């Protein structure tokens, strides 16, 4: 297993939910973390935690975040794409606003960050990319076609990174959770909140993936809080 000490990881979506749990877990584990937030107010940085304002809709914002991370820490060993949105984009809805937003935030933004991070991850020799996808990226079980499409696309992106980065020591993993007890699932009524996965447990799994050596890599990790009847 790789040692965390001295390794630098960027985490998007760090203001809340899984992203914030990942930041807390990695800091506790000894990593240096560059955390992307929409609004850094209310959060406190430290010698190992850098907070950076990031707008997932903006390419210049992504460029600025990666550049600031390298300027601060001098290296980059991992990228966790945890930012995401899930508005309704029904198959029959003629309004494509929500669909466009999800494809931008859930797919294009991670791709931009990965593209910008690749040279630095390759320099590490043990670079890691973890994309927080969803069980909705493995099967479709509700009318929100747009969300499922975005997560299927994120899985495809993960495998593209594996193909491109393999000879450079870059390993990519898609984490595919079902219901996680965050504000993104606050509207869910068909499954009890107390039976949903804890974001801290998802964070621990991500931390484990980061520590795996180049010779033991996971392409996709499915995490569920209930029994699957189909995949």
Regions found by a protein language model. Give the residues of each.
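Conserved glycine-rich cofactor-binding loop
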Residues: 15-16
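Conserved NAD(P)H cofactor-binding loop of Rossmann-fold oxidoreductase domains
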Residues: 82-87
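Substrate-binding pocket helix/loop in short-chain dehydrogenase/reductase
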Residues: 90-91, 95-100
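Active-site helix of classical SDR
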Residues: 114, 150
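Residue(s) in the substrate-gating loop at a strand-loop-helix junction
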Residues: 134
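Active-site-adjacent segment of SDR/Rossmann-fold oxidoreductases
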Residues: 139, 160-170
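C-terminal helical subdomain
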Residues: 167-170, 174-175, 191-231
